[in-house]
Amino acid sequence: MKEIKGTIASPKGFLADAVHAQLKYKNLDLGLILSQVPAAIAGVFTTNKVCAAPVLIDRQIVKKGQARAIICNSAVANAVTGEQGYANALKTQKLLAEKFELKAEEVAVCSTGVIGVQLPMEKIATGISKLSQNEGTAAYFAKAILTTDTQTKTINFEAEIGGQIVNMAGVCKGSGMIHPNMATMLAFITTDAKIAQALLQKTLSEIIETTFNQITVDGDTSTNDTVLLMANGQAKNNEILEGSSDYLLFKEMLAKVCQSLAKQIAADGEGATKLIEVTVKGAPNDLTARFIAKKIVGSSLVKTAIFGADPNWGRIISSIGQVANFEVSDIELKLQDELVLYHSTPVDFDAAFLSEKLKEDKIEIIADLNAGSGLGQAWGCDLTYKYVEINALYTS
């Protein structure tokens, strides 16, 4: 297995494009992913009870298990838009299906942007009419789905599976309202692997728990969170079967794609200057370790301390104590590989030296609870003045 350069359309049988539909002032805002043959589709969605119209539609598509295309607009979330919003999402499906001679129920729709605003359907229709099946425009898709993001987020891997080279590509957006429990977070993954839809869904659901569900920027879960994975079988590999060595390799590749995308989202949190990676080990079990890791990385006090390069490890210990349901009297804690706590007792360290290390753009926090073999990670970012500025003026 190796990481390669590519786009969301690098796996065989996929195409992608994007246009400026004038939903934004000047940037690309309407993107398409198209499989040239029917593809198995898996998905995981927001747990927010107020979910967007596209989420309702896509849940049904994933339930049926097959799709040909994904269309995604930015700038307008099409959430809390009532019956008209749902009708607009269905209309978007229909327009794209007619354009590329597909069935409407084969088209997944996604939206991201401001909540409570209706889609401008004339602009959507005009934009769809401009989408094409050109092979040279796939890289544009990653730009079209952005909102407050400062950069595109992509990843590509390939591996030999079932006697063939299998490609997997991922693209995502997300910068604010990131606290998935599955933020706004959208992620799209394509692969030319041959694998049954039920196994595809099972695998994605498992991997989501240790990747996308372990990132947080601001503690808010979006109405639109969506992860979609399409597998069209065009690599012509022997079908991947659960429990086989091919399956383990496929699952590892999907985990790498999802973790890379999740970390890219965390690093690009609104106003962020640093990626924070928290590793908790020695917990009673993995689930507890992941829960504690996410609590630490989501703490506003921890996030602001990291922004200020302040080695205030007490805030980390406080976060652990708030959620631990077991005895925590033997904690070992490291910041940037510097030991600050051993057997729950403070260790002398050079605060000025550690403060300098906390100015780096990736911060690593490792907590060993010495209470079991559970291991978990979570990712987030620092909390800055810029975050407040961005969100105070978001709809202005």
From Swiss-Prot:
Keyword 4Fe-4S: no
EC assignment: 2.3.1.35, 2.3.1.1
GO BP of this protein: L-arginine biosynthetic process; ornithine biosynthetic process
Gene3D superfamilies found in the cross-reference section: ArgJ beta chain, C-terminal domain (3.10.20.340), L-amino peptidase D-ALA esterase/amidase (3.60.70.12)
Signal peptide bounds: none
Binding, substrate: T147, K173, T184, E270, N391, S396
Catalytic residue list: T184
Catalytic activity: N(2)-acetyl-L-ornithine + L-glutamate = N-acetyl-L-glutamate + L-ornithine; L-glutamate + acetyl-CoA = N-acetyl-L-glutamate + CoA + H(+)
Subcellular location per the Swiss-Prot or TrEMBL entry: Cytoplasm
Site (Cleavage): A183, T184
Broad EC category: transferase
Annotated site (Involved in the stabilization of negative charge on the oxyanion by the formation of the oxyanion hole): T112, G113
Keyword field: Acyltransferase, Amino-acid biosynthesis, Arginine biosynthesis, Autocatalytic cleavage, Cytoplasm, Multifunctional enzyme, Transferase
InterPro entries xrefs: Arg_biosynth_ArgJ (IPR002813), ArgJ-like_dom_sf (IPR016117), ArgJ_beta_C (IPR042195)
Molecular function per GO: glutamate N-acetyltransferase activity; L-glutamate N-acetyltransferase activity
Gene Ontology cellular component list: cytoplasm
Pathway: Amino-acid biosynthesis; L-arginine biosynthesis; L-ornithine and N-acetyl-L-glutamate from L-glutamate and N(2)-acetyl-L-ornithine (cyclic): step 1/1; Amino-acid biosynthesis; L-arginine biosynthesis; N(2)-acetyl-L-ornithine from L-glutamate: step 1/4
Function description: Catalyzes two activities which are involved in the cyclic version of arginine biosynthesis: the synthesis of N-acetylglutamate from glutamate and acetyl-CoA as the acetyl donor, and of ornithine by transacetylation between N(2)-acetylornithine and glutamate.
HAMAP family given in the database record: ArgJ
Family: Belongs to the ArgJ family.
Assembly description: Heterotetramer of two alpha and two beta chains.
Name the UniProt record assigns to this protein: Arginine biosynthesis bifunctional protein ArgJ
Organism annotation: Lactococcus lactis subsp. lactis (strain IL1403) (Streptococcus lactis)
UniProt lineage: Bacteria, Bacillati, Bacillota, Bacilli, Lactobacillales
